[in-house]
């Protein structure tokens, strides 16, 4: 916050910074400000930093994911369209496995293909989220930085009709929950590197387990693999009536 008061947490180790208007204050352009901030974090905290600089949240997040763990990428308005056009559709926030499969089945595999479509066509084919992904495909993201926002967690759970310890059934259910968590995290522009598992036994004993991965994620497969490790440690003769996963 020495650089700007407009800091919005994205996850425990990620944040958006709005550097609009800070050039006059610091007498430096945003790229230099961020380079100095990265150096300071490395020196004082001892962790690597990946920086993405752009004119909206969506592009800044994509930039920050390039060349991790010590990447520094910049996308300006002139470059945005060309940068996005060949990226796979799942890069778009809100495109989880189900929507990705629908798009792919329709022959749409890149962001550039969505950009070429009329917005009404995208909405007709894919529902309300069509407007959202069409705007992102055109590098449009009008969300503002919200400094007061607290780091959020996203979770889904389900209660079974019958208590069970069937491993295949539990893993199938876990995958479905992980997909839901992934889709919601993409829609909200959130990510996390702590995966939480919640299970309730047939005698109503609540068990919570968590695991931390190296990098924040929104990807269902990564969430699932981590949560599955936790689940398999708990499966025994005991039967479960509830299963939940969170990020």
Predicted regions and their residues:
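DNA-contacting surface of Y-family translesion DNA polymerases
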Residues: 91, 99-242
